Swiss-Prot record:
Strongly inhibited by inositol hexakisphosphate. It catalyses: a 1,2-diacyl-sn-glycero-3-phospho-(1D-myo-inositol-3,4-bisphosphate) + H2O = a 1,2-diacyl-sn-glycero-3-phospho-(1D-myo-inositol-3-phosphate) + phosphate; 1D-myo-inositol 1,3,4-trisphosphate + H2O = 1D-myo-inositol 1,3-bisphosphate + phosphate; 1D-myo-inositol 3,4-bisphosphate + H2O = 1D-myo-inositol 3-phosphate + phosphate. Residues 1-20, 464-498, 529-551 are annotated as: Disordered. Pfam families: C2. This is Type II inositol 3,4-bisphosphate 4-phosphatase. Catalyzes the hydrolysis of the 4-position phosphate of phosphatidylinositol 3,4-bisphosphate, inositol 1,3,4-trisphosphate and inositol 3,4-bisphosphate. Plays a role in the late stages of macropinocytosis by dephosphorylating phosphatidylinositol 3,4-bisphosphate in membrane ruffles. Antagonizes the PI3K-AKT/PKB signaling pathway by dephosphorylating phosphoinositides and thereby modulating cell cycle progression and cell survival. Residues 1-13, 475-498, 542-551 have a biased composition (Basic and acidic residues). Keywords: Hydrolase, Lipid metabolism. Pathway: Signal transduction; phosphatidylinositol signaling pathway. The lineage of its organism: Eukaryota, Metazoa, Chordata, Craniata, Vertebrata. Residues 23-148 form the C2 domain.
Length: 924
């Protein structure tokens, strides 16, 4: 129902004093003192003794809130309460809240207009009365409560009273809370709250951190009665995230860098036979086109300004493919009289999917399976490596790229410790160097590397083997290497006229030998140093003579001897490591060349689709991780769980298994699964730029999250030292719309069933790790508070039950996630209708189960949260789903559809048909 306000500019003048109306520029306006990032002003409303137009009529009242701006001197509709039926003393559960950036001052006047709604379906209502007040009057009132007379439009007859009570979220004051009843007519007016925010939400040091992530917050305020007839306050907040565009741009930049590097590595393979050289040229041509396309997309994304999210109307735009649809934070802050303030966050986002690519042939799950099946079942004219081997090659290359710089860094730290002549520091640096080097050596033990070296040898000009190599060829079978024709010497491997497989064993074994030399030298230096110290304190003459001899041997070297003696060994280690890396990279690059040569252009198109879906999923994950970290910084148990176990990330999917949404679900399943290759690292921010930084390549990414210095210092040592923090993404999907009904009756729901079963096993795996790694005292307390085992069993039973539209799966998965301190996501096609229904239902269920919401008010609370009228009648341009991405519109355009009054699809079709008929009749 749209509230229509007539003569807004005239009424604005009417309610303004003459001085303000005529000379607004000469007036100094007084800002409202507020907590940073908190709403500037919040109040709730109640009416008393309303006079009905007809004596025997029961009123159905709604209040329209409008703002008279002192500068523009115009009246702007701002929001509405819900409709309260059948009483002359309505107490409204929906309050009014003004976000931090809203231009409101003490001189701003608020107009309250009360209507009697006669027929909601036909938008029939009548004006009852109105009143107005200045914001400063409310703030400075003795009890921060105003009682205003409602008058008719001519300003004459009094038709009742409206009471305005200021709200400050926080602790409740002593008051008549025990006298609140569940009867609407008997409820008392709002009680005052002191302004106290949860510790993790206050504090100026965190503001840059959150402001770098969230934008354009829009708040809603409610008050609901508890089961013991007391009030609890609820604030809903919806925020956009700047990460919607920041993360895709970071990721595309990494893709470009990685692909350019791969192309260069292909060029540096050296001379190849004509057959392989032609294949390489073809691959490079396609890869260059791919890089150019990514560069064009990045350029277009860099031009985007204005809104921080992509609306669903833009989900098919090519330049915005990598950007998630409707990424928002939906936060519910609850203050109840008995319990500590609580926050409940859900990230809402459209299902990660390649909408521009389309779903005619299915989504990633089906396309990848078909691609790999065809590759297995087809013979080719060149050496073939299975998908497992190409994946292994990428994994080894990823390990090389991660470990080589780490080893170099630890080697330099070892030399620094040596120059400082610090035994303890030397031991610590040596331990880290040894661990990373052992991992490095172990990575090259894989048989694939040996096979790839041989395959590359055969691809050289004249390099022909008597039989083709295989990734699983044994050492005995590879004895034919000595029968190969002579190959001219090059910088690339092999360096012998005949391929010598044992040479590779010697090369990578040299890395281990170099490390052993360093370990032996460090042990010797530390031992001599300890003997020297013991000799200095010796008492016997015999010991003194021995110590004197040892002192001579030690002092014959200058004190920087440690550095000088270790430096050549470190150089040798780096040289050996460099030789191994060069050979391994070339051989494994050749494996990838074979994959690309076979699969063009399908392989690159699948890579593009996977990159698009992963980008959308990653943007949401980073947003959720940062928000979860921010709200839990003062929770030692959470921080310990973060670095000990990692975080579970639960995605609630509401896609049907019908038509295009099957492809979306297949895309989404792969995109969320790919998030397992993402790790987080927390660092100290050294500047005002606290946006997350992304590093890595397609097989492994690290997201660097920056924290202010004061916050960073309070973290556990393991996190401060840069330990990688892992996530465990899981997806549970239950289709709930009409299309799912068709799928269950006439189609196939096996995709949904298999996804739910697979991800249940992942949840069980996480639970096992959680119970194993967390401290016993924490586990003991945790088990006392939560029957997680019972929840898991119940979830498993529901998954096995194969019940139609079994939303119990969603509720159980969400509960398990919250109990495990996880990150919650809710997704449907566009994060609109189904998502909003799910989120509001979940919020009301939490209020009922965790905060004692009165059972008689559950439906009314749900209606309040779903009512579009509580934020006023939005124009088409105010709807975030119809606005242009780059338009600079008022903040109201961003209000999230969680609060919209939603209709089912068939009713929407009827409405469209009727609208078209009316238009035709009008113009005829």
């Amino acid at each position: 129902m749209e509230i229509k306000e007539e003569g807004t500019s005239e009424e604005g003048q009417h309610f303004l004093p003459a001085a303000q109306a005529n000379d607004p520029e000469d007036i100094q306006f007084t800002s409202i003192q507020k907590i940073p990032n908190e709403p500037q002003l919040e109040f709730i409303l109640a009416c008393r003794d309303l006079v009905a137009p007809v004596s025997d009529r029961k009123l159905n009242t709604v209040v329209q809130i409008s703002v008279i701006h002192p500068v523009e001197q115009t009246l702007t509709r701002y929001s509405s309460t819900e409709i309260v039926e059948g009483t002359k003393d309505p107490l409204f559960l929906t309050g009014v809240t003004f976000p931090p950036d809203y231009p409101i001052y003490e001189e701003t006047r608020i107009k309250l207009t009360v209507y009697d709604v006669k027929d909601k379906s036909h938008d029939t209502r009548s004006f009852l009365g109105c009143a107005s007040f200045k914001v400063g009057e409310l703030l400075k009132s003795k009890e921060q409560l105003l009682s205003l007379s409602l008058r008719t439009s001519d300003g004459g007859k009094v038709v009742g009273t409206i009471e305005v009570s200021l709200v400050k979220m926080g602790e409740i004051e002593d008051g008549d809370t025990d006298h609140i009843t569940t009867d609407v007519q008997g409820q008392k007016c709002a009680l005052m709250y002191e302004s106290t925010a949860p510790e993790s939400l206050s504090g100026k040091e965190n503001l840059p951190f959150m402001n770098a992530v969230l934008r354009n917050p829009v708040c809603k305020l409610y008050r609901f009665p508890t089961s013991d007839n007391k009030w609890m306050r609820i604030r809903e907040q919806m925020s956009e995230s700047i990460l919607s565009f920041h993360i895709p741009k970071e990721l595309i930049s990494l893709h470009i860098k990685e692909d350019l590097c791969r192309n260069q590595e292909l060029k540096e393979l050296g001379d190849l036979s004509p057959h392989w050289d032609n294949l390489r040229k073809n691959v490079l041509s396609h890869c260059d086109q791919m890089v150019t396309m990514y560069q064009d997309i990045l350029t277009e994304l860099s031009k985007e300004t204005g809104s921080s999210f992509k609306s669903s109307s833009s989900k098919g735009e090519k330049t915005l493919e990598f950007v998630p649809v409707n990424l928002h934070l939906q936060r519910m802050q609850v203050h109840s009289p008995h319990l500590k303030d609580a926050l409940y966050d859900v990230i809402t986002v459209g299902a990660p999917a390649a909408h521009f690519q389309g779903f005619k042939n299915g989504g990633l799950r089906k396309l990848l399976h078909r691609f790999e099946t065809e590759r297995r079942n087809t013979g080719y004219q060149f050496i073939y490596y299975s998908p497992e081997n190409t994946a292994k090659a990428k994994e080894v290359l990823s390990s090389i790229n991660q470990l080589q710089p780490l080893i170099a860094t630890h080697a330099d730290l070892l030399l620094t410790s040596a120059s400082q002549r610090s035994p303890d520091s030397l031991k610590s640096s040596l331990k880290l160097l040894s661990e990373k080097t052992e991992l490095f050596v172990h990575a090259f033990k894989d048989q694939l590397v040996r096979s790839a070296l041989l395959a590359l040898y055969t691809a050289r000009p004249g390099g022909i083997l008597k039989k083709p190599p295989s990734p699983n060829v044994s050492t005995e079978e590879k004895s034919t290497q000595h029968d190969t024709p002579q190959l001219r010497r090059q910088d690339s491997i092999p360096h012998h006229s005949d391929y010598d497989e044992e040479e590779w064993d010697r090369v990578w074994a040299n890395v281990g030998k170099s490390l052993n030399c360093i370990i032996a030298k460090v042990d010797k230096l530390i031992e001599r140093d300890s003997h020297n110290e013991e000799g200095a304190g010796g008492s016997s003459s015999k010991d003194g003579e021995a110590d004197h001899t040892l002192e001579d041997s030690i002092t014959s070297h200058p004190r920087e001897d440690w550095y000088e003696q270790l430096h050549p060994l470190i150089l040798t280690l780096k040289e050996c490591m460099g030789e191994v890396v060069n050979r391994a990279k070339q051989s494994l690059t050749f494996v990838l060349l074979q994959e690309l040569a076979y699969s063009l252009p399908q392989c690159l198109m699948l890579t593009l689709r996977r990159d698009i879906v992963f980008s959308q999923a990653l943007a949401g994950l980073v947003c959720g991780f940062i928000i979860k970290l921010h709200t839990s910084l003062h929770d030692p148990g959470f921080l310990q769980q973060l670095h000990t176990v990692g975080l579970i990330v639960q995605y609630e999917g509401l896609l049907s298994t019908y038509s295009d949404e099957i492809g979306m679900l297949e895309d989404m399943a792969v995109g969320i699964s790919d998030l397992r290759k993402v790790a987080f690292k927390i660092t100290e921010a050294t500047s005002n730029d606290v946006l997350p930084v992304l590093t890595g390549r397609r097989e492994h990414y690290v997201v660097e999250v920056k924290l202010p210095a004061t916050v960073f210092e309070s973290l556990p040592l393991q996190i401060k030292e840069g330990q990688l923090l892992h996530v465990y993404p899981v997806l549970f999907n239950v289709g709930i719309n009409e299309q799912q009904t068709l799928a269950e009756r006439f189609g196939d729901v096996s995709l949904q069933e298999s996804i739910n079963q697979e991800n249940f096993e992942l949840v069980q795996e996480y639970y096992s790790i959680f119970m194993e790694k967390m401290p016993p005292d924490y586990i003991s307390h945790f088990q006392e508070q939560t029957d997680l085992k019972g929840l898991l069993d119940n979830l498993h039973q529901n998954i096995q039950a194969k019940k139609r539209k079994n939303v119990e799966i969603m509720w159980l998965a969400a509960t398990i996630c919250r109990k495990l301190n996880g990150i919650r996501f809710t997704c449907c096609k566009s994060a609109k209708d189904r998502t909003s229904m799910s989120v509001t239902l979940e919020q009301c269920s939490i209020l009922r189960d965790e905060h004692q919401l009165h059972k008689d008010f559950f439906i009314r609370a749900l209606d309040c949260m779903r009512s579009r009228q509580t934020q006023g009648a939005l124009n088409e341009s105010d709807d975030p789903e119809t606005g242009c991405l780059t338009d600079n519109k008022p903040t109201s355009r961003h209000f999230y559809p969680v609060a919209l009054l939603l209709v089912s699809s068939h009713l929407l079709v009827v409405w469209l048909i009727l609208s078209l008929a009316l238009l035709l009749a009008k113009y005829q």
